[in-house]
Amino acid sequence: MAAPMLRWGCRGRRWAFARVDGGSCHRRGAPTGSTSNQIRGESSVAQQPLHTAQKTRKGEHKWAAVVGLEIHAQISSNSKLFSGSQVRFSAPPNSLVSFFDASLPGTLPVLNRRCVEAAVMTGLALNCHINKKSLFDRKHYFYADLPAGYQITQQRLPIAVNGSLIYGVCAGKKQSQVIPKTVRIKQIQLEQDSGKSLHDNLRSQTLIDLNRAGVGLLEVVLEPDMSCGEEAATAVRELQLILQALGTSQANMAEGQLRVDANISVHHPGEPLGVRTEVKNLNSIRFLAKAIDYEIQRQINELENGGEILNETRSFHHKLGCTMSMRDKEGKQDYRFMPEPNLPPLVLYDATSLPAGADPQQVINIDQIRETLPELPSVTREKLVQQYGMLLEHSFTLLNEVGLLEFFQNVIKETRAEPKKVTSWVLNTFLGYLKQQNLAVSESPVTPSALAELLDLLDSRTISSSAAKQVFEELWKREGKTPGQIVSEKQLELMQDQGALEQLCHSVMEAHPQVVMDVKNRNPRAINKLIGLVRKATQSRADPVMIKEILEKKLSL
């Protein structure tokens, strides 16, 4: 039976940032031996009582979890890394394969300039040092969807090294505090993608599609500075937003444009690092968090029961919610790395090293690319907070949901309502409806202009808040009516006749003398009860602000 999930302190999952309670994920985890030999701070993990064959008592020691990531992002380019074949998702099988992609003898690689520029741009955005000279290598292994028997990558000297990624972790019971956390980036390297193996169980066949073979990849190696699934998922989501903002990768995990391998180990604080396992090909942020948390708990259970952790590769079964062994790595695989003989060193320049009279089309200028960097998500969040006075966690949510920031900005442009009111309606009402029906922003039946018109009606006190929600429900039905038409048809306008409201308030006061007495006796709830009675008599069409003013005047408050 699968081991129970570990109860982490950072349980409340949000797309934009992780929740951390009790400090269990506030400290950095120690790195595994896979990507760094430095010892960092450790994060303790709450332990559940387990049966064990060891002599130590249960709960005597805490556990520290260590998580590192290898992220493969498919570069947004018209052609592949070393050939002129097109890159297009869902093309017919083997319809985008050049002679080089199929590894026919005599074919040679030609480096794609766009892929190099994308790697430099990504490295700069992630605070990396860009190597002016980088090298290509062959990584040998046999698999059916790798026709050459090797992959061209950058093992010795990658294009970018020593960067950092800052992401936000939301802490506290009300999620009101965003704590910045940093994960180091070991390197970014250019490499080829492999083809796809398609398994036909009905015919007991494995079919090969080479359309993806040779597509340019950015491999981003994150040092093991994370300590739970939520931290890893949040870091990957932030990287995804950065890649999309840069335009260097669409980073659509559903289409395999962003794939993650997680290296995970556990140990007692102050003791040597544990044996790590690698969970491969995680293609969803939600599954990434689940797989890491499960694997951490599985390792703890195994060690508490007197077992040992194998250095192995595992996969995540999303239906069962557990990791499963694929192959062990005890006999370390020899990839026989060697320099790529058909590619010279990749040489880049900056403003100081650029040769005089160099053709801009023949060289890549690092400083020139730096000047073209677009606004990054962190800067956008700061602007949202400063310009609209919203909470930082709200800015995370706006950026995190695809298309939501653009929707919000379009509403802001078309309405007179205050930004805080727009923020509340977009993040609470609008986003809530989307989540209930599992819709993307682009699939919403409510347009920015319709919501803007509704907020204008509310802001001008033409309708009440309850009526506005009723109008929104009608808009969601896709009947093609405007908010103004709905208000008119259902007679939802607030009563503006001062004389009629005064008469109505007088009638309610006469009908409820005890409530009037309570108001005069300074009962704070009594005035609200009177307001409610008046609004009930008008089917909620009376403006509560006007009612309160009239009642206070009549009662001499």
Curated annotation (Swiss-Prot):
Entry-linked Gene3D superfamilies: 1.10.10.410
Transit peptide: 1-41
Tissue specificity as recorded in UniProt: Predominantly expressed in tissues characterized by high rates of oxidative phosphorylation (OxPhos), including muscle and heart.
Keywords for the protein's UniProt record, in alphabetical order: ATP-binding, Ligase, Mitochondrion, Nucleotide-binding, Primary mitochondrial disease, Protein biosynthesis, Transit peptide
InterPro entries: Asn/Gln-tRNA_amidoTrfase_suB/E, Asn/Gln-tRNA_Trfase_suB/E_cat, Asn/Gln_amidotransferase, Asn/Gln_tRNA_amidoTrase-B-like, GatB, GatB_Yqey_C_2, Gln-tRNA_amidoTrfase_suB_CS, Gln_synth/guanido_kin_cat_dom
Listed GO MF terms: ATP binding; glutaminyl-tRNA synthase (glutamine-hydrolyzing) activity
Location(s) in or outside the cell: Mitochondrion
Catalytic activity: L-glutamyl-tRNA(Gln) + L-glutamine + ATP + H2O = L-glutaminyl-tRNA(Gln) + L-glutamate + ADP + phosphate + H(+)
Residue numbers spanned by region Disordered: 26-45
Primary location group: mitochondrion
Superkingdom of origin organism: Eukaryota
Residues where N6-succinyllysine is found: K529
Any one Pfam family match given in the protein's UniProt record, by short name: GatB_N
Composition bias, Polar residues: 32-45
Any one GO cellular component localisation term in the record: mitochondrion
PROSITE patterns the UniProt entry points to: GATB
Annotated disorder: Combined oxidative phosphorylation deficiency 41: An autosomal recessive mitochondrial disorder characterized by prenatal onset, fetal hydrops, intrauterine growth retardation, hypertrophic cardiomyopathy, respiratory insufficiency, lactic acidosis, and decreased activities of mitochondrial respiratory complexes I, III, IV, and V. The disorder is lethal, with death occurring in the perinatal period.
SUBUNIT field: Subunit of the heterotrimeric GatCAB amidotransferase (AdT) complex, composed of A (QRSL1), B (GATB) and C (GATC) subunits.
Function in brief: Allows the formation of correctly charged Gln-tRNA(Gln) through the transamidation of misacylated Glu-tRNA(Gln) in the mitochondria. The reaction takes place in the presence of glutamine and ATP through an activated gamma-phospho-Glu-tRNA(Gln).
Protein name: Glutamyl-tRNA(Gln) amidotransferase subunit B, mitochondrial
Organism field: Homo sapiens
